A protein has these predicted regions:
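Short, well-structured N-terminal submotif of metal-dependent ribonuclease cores
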Residues: 1-63, 70-81, 89, 107-113, ...
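Active-site neighborhoods of divalent-metal-dependent phosphate/nucleic-acid chemistry enzymes
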Residues: 2-3, 89-147, 171
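Short secondary-structure boundary segments
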Residues: 25, 65, 136-138
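A short helix-to-beta-strand connector/capping loop
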Residues: 57, 87-89, 158-162
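Residues at the C-termini of beta-strands that transition into short coil/loop
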Residues: 65, 95, 167-168
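C-terminal end-helix/capping segment
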Residues: 142-163
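Short, C-terminally biased terminal segments at protein or domain edges
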Residues: 159-173
Length: 173
């Protein structure tokens, strides 16, 4: 095997081995929002920017139509910034199985009606067998309760559970 073939094969292997990350809409929102006066939110915004610049190039990052739906809401100028930030991210498909799984999560995780799309984000990441689901939603997605219950539910369904984490928890891949 020539050196060029080895190098090509190594690069192909590296590409194939990149971790996959589903970015829930809070990631895009924190990335593009004007700096907050709230110290915790401002820190999350800064961590998100660092993650976007340093880690995102090392992973295969995805969003879904649900993310596009959420980032398109609200103030038109802010929504446009979010849409622009997400425009080059691959969008995972949605199908009936994902919708059914989202409904199951919605009920079993006791997610409030106003946060129904949080169950959809979980279902997309699970169905597509994504490695990490990245979010700043620490109530209905990245919470100890949800992590535990989701693993239990998915074990009974024979489904792989992604690692649910914040950008701060995924600074290295």
């Amino acid at each position: 095997m020539t050196q060029a073939n080895k190098t090509f094969q190594q690069k192909m292997l590296e590409i194939a081995m990149k971790p996959t990350v589903y970015m829930e809409s809070t990631i895009i929102s924190y990335l593009t929002a004007r700096p907050s006066r709230d110290l915790i939110v401002a820190a999350h915004q800064q961590i998100t920017v660092e993650w976007w610049e340093d880690v995102r190039p090392k992973v295969d990052a995805f969003i879904s139509p649900f993310v596009n739906q959420e980032i398109s809401r609200g103030d038109e100028k802010a929504a446009q910034k979010r849409i622009e930030a997400a425009k080059n991210l691959p969008v995972l498909e949605i199908n009936d199985e994902i919708q059914k799984l989202a409904e199951k999560y919605f009920v079993m995780l006791e997610i409030p009606e106003k946060s129904r799309l949080d169950a959809a984000h979980l279902a997309v990441a699970v169905w597509h067998e994504i490695d990490y689901l990245l979010s700043w939603n620490c109530r209905h997605i990245v919470s100890g309760r949800v992590k535990k219950l989701l693993e239990e539910i998915n074990a009974t369904l024979n489904l792989k559970t992604p690692v649910l984490c914040t950008p701060e928890e995924l600074m290295e891949v």
